[in-house]
Amino acid sequence: MQMLFRQRIFSWFDSYDIYAEDGSVLYTVKGQLSWGHCLKIFDADGCEVGTVKERVFTFLPKFELFLGEDYIGCISKEFTPFRPGFTVDCNGWQVQGDFWEWDYQILTAQGLVAATVSKELLQWSDTYCIDVTNPCDALPALMVVLAIDAEKCSRNN
């Protein structure tokens, strides 16, 4: 299953549209005013299905992931001197690849690819292609990508 993750150009808070391969909107992500990033994820019908919330007052950025109201894990920035690294505490997943900006994989506890993420270049706004192996992992994979993108935005500001 492929998803196209596109940030809206003119939005006050972080806002994204997530599209299916056929161009239909799968999810809409709306940032909320809060301490740290708080991203609410809505399905195509407008129902809230998940939240990515930055935990504030931590030494390194940490994002909590919620499916509905249920906590499913977190993603934390690691202290690495030469390239960004992340620890994922969600579904036993790991993230590997080029975090500097663009291409990485989300791996299962067994080392299988759960999702492949690549940034599309020469776009007006941040645009990523997320290729998910199992459609059941689409929303958690999207939340990991949102957390990494939010951390990169904070780092670049």
Name every feature range the model reports, one short phrase each.
Residues 1-157:
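Intrinsically disordered, low-complexity proline/glycine-rich segments
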